[in-house]
Swiss-Prot record:
The lineage of its organism: Viruses, Duplodnaviria, Heunggongvirae, Peploviricota, Herviviricetes. A motif (Required for filament formation) lies at residues 820-821. This is Major DNA-binding protein. Residues 1173-1191 are annotated as: Required for nuclear localization. The keyword Mitochondrion does not apply. Homooligomers. Forms double-helical filaments necessary for the formation of replication compartments within the host nucleus. Interacts with the origin-binding protein. Interacts with the helicase primase complex; this interaction stimulates primer synthesis activity of the helicase-primase complex. Interacts with the DNA polymerase. Interacts with the alkaline exonuclease; this interaction increases its nuclease processivity. Belongs to the herpesviridae major DNA-binding protein family. Transmembrane segments: none annotated. Its main location: host cell. It comes from Murid herpesvirus 1 (strain Smith) (MuHV-1).
Length: 1191
């Protein structure tokens, strides 16, 4: 229970710290590579990482003192914002930052154009002299950089300059390899007699402050406040559709200081954008405005509840523990690794920018009437309203006039216009007009691929760079045209999102970290046993500490109310039997799952694949019999659900400030989508009768807010954790705040500590689902399977094996694998091509045609396998579904992993070191050709490739970009409960990646409608270390499995014992021969084999063999065998005495023992219809796969 105690998870400590770190070139380079920077803006926004911006003793959640009472201090829980703001001595950081032009001027223009409120420094405040503070700390101001990290609840106080530094409590720290000092900052409320003392005169919390003591001692930096104003508060206002940022800050300050979560804060000054362009009736307008206000208020209140809570740092929060840092031998290597990681992130940035349904653009609320839905009763009216209101792309309606609280029309405050195309001003707006964020996105734009449309190509970039030499560039005046934002937009012009022409329902694209648990295989949760165990434990998926059971059991079971599909059948048992067969026969690696299949001849190929197919088909039949015995049918199978979980901790994506920026957008979107449920219910039950929206909201908000607290709990989508404080009162030695304010003297006293809340709620995860099989009687045309077309085997299910084994099957044939099989199918293969024995070749071709046609006949997955694991999974599920009458294609989740690929130098002007001065395109191209000849490394970009086994992406804790919509459905049990689930969706537009484009529609290939893509970057071995389970504790088990696989190998090209010895000796020191007892463990207690291997190893060691690789062992034993054969004339045994005996000549004729096995094959054919002793051939309910004799 101590692990769930709030007092242990969140110690009493300050929630704002100011760090001063010794300036070093290395630190400046690293911070510049990972932070949000603009060349002309002094504040740098860096990630919150241990050993980079904070020390190792830093805690991710604290109970911070907020106010005093007689004899004690009242604390409030808060977590930290996942970034650090560098504000002092940032010149060295900015010196190495790429220049992207006059971004500050662009952001100013965007504010004027779209009516965004601009920052104004506080009138009565002077900038705090940091040099004086450094002198008090005893450090030289010019030799240290300064940055501040802030708790979420105190960011408004930091903005307003109402935090008091306490140099007397400064602590020397070491952050990474850098020495420094950290200073706590306390809120002014501790020094003014507490919040209660000021209530007599009015609210105690306000941005404007006239207290002389606070004005003198409070820390205020206008540049830091400006960075907060745009990067955080303006962005939050866009998510909440609140345009007056200053009043949003005021409301946030009052909310945390005075605990006003259940009162109305935003609606009195809220303005309603994007309404006048919608064709709304008066009733629809009133409903939409009321729901808009309620959703904003609930999101603002519950963001404080969820963020001012307990969160622990993630596994990727320690910078020096990142594998990419540990693997760097030099500082230059580290910077290269960081740059490569940023390039991987570029693909996720592309998803967030180039998809027009990105979370960044979801800043508008719209009314989309449900066709054919009438309001016949209150529940139906609520459902109709719930389905009609959607959050939508804010690129539409940006110039609409505004409605105020009294529903009166106000003229738009910006520059009225009409946009036909996405521009830099739009991106600046959705960046909150933050120059640091916009400039960093330009760094990514400069390193993304150019997508040529055939009309515009790379020549456009060349022409722009050449013309930029005249210094006419409006973005930079010609000083940095190779990197400025104008060039960046020209490079990605064909990828930019379109401005929607009509309002419609769309999912939203987000980027979050995945959690380990996932039902990601083809049939998801169908036929898995864990559901029974979690339900017997009574965990329904709410807020327990068990990280696995709550995610497994979240929501009602798919596939029937009884949940029999979880209990009665075990699909994974039968699929696991096939995988065990593959491991035992050395088809796949026992640990990694990678293909290690080794075939030498055509007969070997046929025999291996035939045996594998037979194993799969047998397993399918046994599973089908198990399903029938359990009483399952098509309905239960149709209820299968694929799902995975995304981490909602603010620290999960703290390694990238860009992703932290969109994290807040995602959090607000999720809360507001859930808030629609309560808002729609109250609006239908209590129609608007007042002249002002704020009056209605004020009247009902307390009830709505209380009801919303239970709305997301155990409803299938959101997973929230409760943490309770087990101690009502504690005593700590802390600063005497009142004495310090009154006398200026610092002292610590034993103080009674109480918490404002005895329990807090924190966001844990959300669940995204996909139904592979449609439950509707008539499937869409996109899922209909047409007439079977016979495929060329090279484009069929075994193509990956044909490519891999081409050289062994057809040595020295002189044709590529693709050309060879195309000629075979066209019957145009010349006789000069050596195909080996014609009989064997004919058997191989007939076999491939038969297997390909058989696979295609039952194929409902429609994914071409590219490894044995995917082949096994696809064939197993195809056969199983075909037995139960499923003939239409299923919907599948496609995992796309990021990778880096080299590109043409000339497509990347950012490689130029100085402003370009080229007279012609030819000169430009020639310069880059010379650059290539001079050895300049080719630029790399992030591309995506399909992951054969989707589950691997989640096992490896990946960063995931995915599109989903929060769907709601009413309870069927007669209650008013509304359940939710995250339905996986699609990307809108063609700029995210060419692999996701929908260009196949004209060819009637509708796979793009059946595939649901997720873009993933594996973080294991990059930011996250492999668990000890994989690396240390089970190394012996890994070696053991590989030794046993080598002994079970049926390959004829190597002695199994030699292969086992090679596996056993790999990684051992020279001459370290294991003893018999050790070998017995590795060979599963097979004593004769252990002694034989031991004798061989000792004999080889005595002859001076030190290299125990397989090639070296074969050479050594071949030499020994030849010598022994000449001297002894064949006396002795190959196993006795370490490898003596006559050498076998495998190039000569072989014995034919096939007649010995003919009876066995016949027996297998006779028993083909029996499964566990039951004859199933006469059953009419499903079809069995045809059994083929082994060739």
């Amino acid at each position: 229970m101590a692990d769930d105690d709030l007092s242990s998870l969140a110690p009493v400590a300050p929630a704002v710290w100011m760090f001063f770190l010794k300036k070093t070139r290395e630190l400046a380079d690293i911070v510049a590579a990972m932070s949000l920077c603009d060349k002309a803006t002094p504040v740098v926004i860096a990630p919150l990482l241990i050993d980079l911006t904070v020390d190792r003793d830093f805690c991710g959640a604290v109970r911070t003192p907020m106010s005093t009472y007689e004899g004690g201090v009242l604390t409030k829980v808060t977590s930290f914002c996942p970034f650090a703001f560098f504000f002092h001595n940032t010149d060295e950081i900015l010196d190495v930052v790429e220049d992207h032009g006059d971004v500050v001027h662009l952001c100013d223009d965007a504010r004027r154009r779209f009516g965004v409120q601009a920052f104004s420094p506080l009138a009565n405040r002077d900038r705090t002299d940091v040099d004086v503070l450094c002198d008090e700390l005893g450090i030289a101001p010019a030799e240290y950089t300064g940055h501040v990290v802030c708790g979420n609840g105190l960011k408004e106080l930091l903005y307003a300059g109402q935090l008091i530094p306490c140099p007397e409590e400064a602590v020397k720290v070491q952050v990474g390899a850098v020495d420094g000092v950290k200073v706590p900052l306390y809120p002014y409320t501790l020094f003014s007699g507490g919040a209660d003392a000021a209530h007599a005169d009015g609210p105690s919390a306000a941005v404007a402050c006239d207290d002389p003591w606070v004005l003198e001692h409070g820390f205020y930096d206008p540049a830091l406040s400006e960075a907060l104003f745009y990067f955080m508060f303006t962005s939050w206002g866009q998510s909440l559709r609140v345009c007056e940022t200053s009043r949003l800050i005021e409301a946030g300050l009052q909310q945390f200081v005075e605990d006003t979560q259940q009162t109305v804060k935003l609606t009195p000054f809220k303005k309603y954008h994007g309404y006048t362009s919608q064709k709304l009736t008066a009733v629809e307008r009133d409903q939409l405005m009321t729901v808009d206000a309620v959703c904003s208020e609930l999101a603002f209140s519950y963001a404080s509840i969820y963020l001012d809570s307990v969160y622990e740092f993630s596994t990727a929060s320690n910078f020096l523990e990142w594998p990419l840092v540990k693997n760097a031998k030099t500082h230059a290597d580290l910077l290269d690794n960081l740059r490569d990681f940023q390039l991987h992130l570029a693909k996720h940035i592309a998803a967030l920018i180039f998809s027009s349904n990105s979370i960044l653009y979801q800043t508008r609320i719209v009314f989309v009437p449900s066709a054919g839905k009438g309001a016949n009763s209150n529940p139906s009216a609520q459902d109709s309203l719930l389905k009609s209101i959607r959050f939508f792309n804010g690129l539409t309606g940006m110039y609409d006039d505004i409605l105020n609280d009294a529903k009166k029309t106000i003229r738009f405050e910006g520059a009225v216009g009409r946009d036909e195309k996405y521009s830099p001003h739009h991106l600046a707006y959705f960046c909150g007009t933050s120059p640091q964020l916009f400039s960093t996105l330009m760094w990514f734009f400069n390193r993304m691929s150019i997508y040529s449309t055939g009309v515009t190509s790379g020549d456009t970039v060349f022409s722009h760079i050449v013309n930029a030499g005249s210094k006419l560039c409006g973005a930079c005046g010609g000083r940095c045209c190779h990197t400025c934002y104008a060039t960046s937009f020209i490079r990605v012009n064909t990828r930019l999102p379109g401005i929607p022409k009509q309002i419609k329902k769309e999912p939203v694209v987000v980027t979050l970290l995945s959690r380990a648990f996932a039902d990601a295989d083809l049939l998801g949760n169908y036929g898995k046993r864990y559901g029974l165990e979690s339900r017997e434990a009574g965990d329904g998926g709410g807020g327990g500490a068990g990280g696995r059971t709550d995610e497994v059991a979240a929501g009602p079971p798919a596939g029937g109310a009884s949940g029999l599909n979880f209990v009665s059948v075990d699909r994974m048992k039968y699929l696991g039997q096939v995988l065990d067969y593959c491991k035992k026969n050395s088809l796949i690696d026992a640990i990694t799952g990678e293909d290690i299949i080794n075939v030498r001849t055509k007969r070997d190929f046929v025999a291996t694949v035939t045996a594998l197919n037979q194993t799969i088909d047998d397993a399918v039949c046994r599973f089908a019999m198990d399903v029938r015995r359990s009483g399952h049918g098509r309905d239960e199978i149709s209820g299968s659900t694929q799902s995975f979980n995304l981490d909602l901790s603010p620290y999960a994506t703290a390694f990238s400030p860009v992703l932290s920026f969109q994290y807040y957008r995602t959090m607000f979107s999720i809360i507001q989508n859930l808030a629609l449920i309560n808002a729609a219910s109250y609006v239908v039950d209590n129609p608007l009768t007042t002249a002002q929206i704020s009056k209605w909201v004020t009247l009902h908000f307390q009830s709505i807010c209380g009801a919303f607290g239970t709305t997301p709990l155990k409803k299938g989508f959101l997973n929230v954790k409760d943490t309770k404080n087990l101690k009502s009162v504690e005593f700590e030695r802390i600063m005497d705040f009142r004495s310090f304010q009154e006398t200026g003297r610092y002292r610590k006293i034993s103080t009674e500590i109480k918490s404002c809340k005895m329990s807090v709620q924190s966001l844990k995860s959300c669940r995204i689902k996909n139904r592979p099989i449609s439950k509707t009687p008539q499937s869409s045309v996109f899922f209909k399977k047409g007439a079977l077309q016979r495929k060329n085997p090279i484009k069929g299910c075994l193509s990956f094996l044909l490519f891999r084994c081409h050289e062994k099957l057809f040595p020295r044939c002189g044709l590529s694998c693709l050309e060879f099989w195309q000629r075979v199918l066209q019957n145009s293969l010349p006789r000069s091509v050596n195909v080996g024995k014609v009989e064997d070749f004919d058997n191989l071709v007939r076999f491939l045609l038969t297997v390909t046609d058989d696979y295609d006949e039952s194929d409902v997955v429609d994914i071409q396998p590219d490894c044995l694991l995917s082949y096994v999974e696809n064939r197993f599920h195809n056969k199983f579904l075909y037995m139960f009458g499923f003939r239409d294609y299923m919907s599948t989740i496609q995992g796309m992993s990021t990778r880096l690929t080299p590109q043409n130098h000339s497509q990347f002007p950012c490689l130029l070191k100085d402003a370009p001065k080229f007279a012609s395109i030819a000169e430009y191209v020639l310069h880059f050709k010379k650059m290539k000849l001079d050895g300049v490394k080719a630029p790399q970009v992030a591309t995506i490739t399909r992951e054969p086994v989707l589950k691997k992406l989640f096992d490896g804790r990946s960063l995931v970009s995915v599109s989903f919509a929060v769907e709601k459905y009413s309870s069927s049990m007669g209650t008013r409960d509304v359940f939710q689930f995250g339905q996986i969706g699609y990307y809108v537009g063609s700029g995210v990646d060419r692999s996701l484009n929908t260009g196949s529609m004209g060819t009637q290939d509708y796979r793009f409608m059946r595939y649901r893509y997720i873009i993933a970057t594996k973080l294991v071995d990059v930011l996250i270390r492999r668990s000890r389970r994989e690396n240390v504790m089970y190394d012996r088990d890994v070696v053991r499995s590989r030794v046993l696989a080598a002994l079970d190998s049926t390959g004829l090209d190597v002695d199994p014992e030699l292969a086992a010895i090679a596996e056993l000796m790999e990684g051992r020191d020279e001459g370290d021969i294991p003893e018999i007892d050790d070998i017995l463990f590795y060979v599963d207690q097979q004593e004769y084999i252990a002694r034989s291997m031991y004798r061989k190893m000792r004999s080889l060691a005595e002859r001076g063999v030190t290299d125990f690789s397989l090639a070296s062992l074969r050479e050594a034993t071949a030499t020994n065998a030849t010598a022994a054969g000449s001297a002894a004339g064949g006396g002795g045994s190959a196993t006795e005495g370490g490898g003596g005996g006559a050498a076998a000549d495998e190039s000569g004729p072989m014995y034919d023992f096939s007649a010995l096995f003919s009876r066995r094959d016949e027996a297998e054919d006779v028993n083909a219809g029996l499964i566990n002793g039951d004859d199933v051939r006469g059953d009419d309910e499903f079809e069995l796969p045809s059994k083929r004799s082994r060739l």
